[in-house]
Amino acid sequence: MNNNTYWYEFRQNNSGGSFVVDDKVCHRIYIEAEDFREAVIIAERLGCYWNGVKKGIDCPCCGDRWSKWDKDPIDLEKYNTEGMNAEVYDGVYPDTKAEWNKKYGHYEIIERPKFVNDYGRAYKGRIKIKNIEEYAQFMADSYGWTVPDARIYYKDGTVKEVFSKRSD
């Protein structure tokens, strides 16, 4: 990102029980643009569409495949200073701490992880996210629904694919 561009995130819902993955779209796409309007135009060129249920394209019970719900750019400065929660729920993996370290141990740690009981027992800490690549990797490792899990579209035309490092 330069001083005149921002990062926008578009997420795909698995409408009809599956995700669309091709050479342009996957679960999440990140677009560098001067404003939200430009990001939407780029997303549409890549194959994103809006109001799919209303148009009869998407499953009415699952909902629209794509949405433009978040017009604000990704706040990388906030995630670089305040960090993001990084958690692994206990009982999902054979070794919860090892799984947390596999997913998040390579990030700069702001708050060391510990077991907490919020919405179930989780091993939770805070990590620093320094750039769009780290943000996309964090989201891929947290959700990891498709292969690739994300694509980053840079303003200069460069495209980077991001793959989950999850073990499940």
Positions of predicted regions on the chain:
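Short aromatic-glycine-(Arg/Gly/Cys) micro-motifs in beta-strand/loop hairpins
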Residues: 1-26, 109-111, 117
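Generic alpha-helix signal with a bias toward terminal, lower-confidence helices
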Residues: 20-22, 41-43, 164
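Short, mixed-charge low-complexity intrinsically disordered segments
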Residues: 45-168
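A short, structured loop/turn motif at beta-sheet edges
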Residues: 1-4, 31-42
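Generic "edge-of-domain/loop-turn" microfeature
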Residues: 15-17, 36-38, 134
